[in-house]
């Protein structure tokens, strides 16, 4: 007979994963990557340390997922703002201004996401979102060049 997870078990497993990710984000916000330990994450999530490793093979994998979740949220906010702006110039200004304001509200987390030294897996996730944000900015600059909001000065050559 094949084991089949009940809806209740599936819900509990998903809840545990969310609790782990939320706890990790909270602790990284307080102390960065280097100061955050898996045992502390587990305790904050109300789980055993070993349970964390059922969901994530390593601390670096967990942190890469935290970085990806937070970065995706920030990228979505910037994209929504840019898309809702009346023109590319306003979109670029408002998106960057919002990004900076949000980063300043949680400087420790922003430093971890943007610049804190980290493991290769975390840095790979970081680069994915740097490219996505630069792509959004380039889209706005290109649109602004087409509509005359920005001068054409070979911005692409710098990227």
Feature-to-residue mapping (PLM):
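Helix-turn-helix
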Residues: 19, 27-61, 65
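Short amphipathic alpha-helical elements of helix-turn-helix/winged-helix folds
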Residues: 23-27, 98, 102, 136
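Amphipathic alpha-helical packing segments from all-alpha helical-bundle domains
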Residues: 72-75, 102-105, 121-147, 157-158
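Hydrophobic/aromatic-rich alpha-helical bundle segments in the mid-to-C-terminal region
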Residues: 111-115, 145-159
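Short linear capping/connector segments at secondary-structure termini
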Residues: 80, 113-121
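N-terminal intrinsically disordered/low-complexity leader segments
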Residues: 1-15
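Hydrophobic alpha-helical connector segments
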Residues: 65, 76-105, 156-159
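Generic hydrophobic, amphipathic alpha-helix propensity
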Residues: 13-24, 41, 62, 66-70, ...
């Amino acid at each position: 007979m094949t084991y089949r997870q009940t809806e209740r078990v599936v819900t509990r497993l998903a809840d545990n994963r969310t609790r782990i990710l939320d706890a990790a984000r909270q602790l990284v916000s307080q102390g960065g990557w280097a100061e955050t330990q898996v045992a502390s994450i587990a305790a904050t999530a109300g789980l055993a340390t070993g349970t964390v490793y059922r969901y994530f093979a390593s601390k670096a994998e967990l942190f890469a997922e935290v970085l990806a979740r937070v970065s995706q949220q920030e990228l979505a906010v910037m994209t929504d703002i840019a898309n809702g702006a009346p023109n590319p110039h306003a979109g670029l200004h408002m998106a960057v201004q919002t990004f900076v304001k949000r980063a300043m509200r949680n400087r420790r987390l922003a430093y971890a996401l943007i610049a804190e030294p980290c493991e290769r897996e975390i840095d790979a996730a970081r680069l994915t979102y740097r490219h996505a944000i630069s792509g959004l900015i380039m889209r706005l600059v290109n649109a602004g060049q087409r509509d005359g909001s920005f001068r054409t000065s070979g911005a692409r050559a710098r990227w």
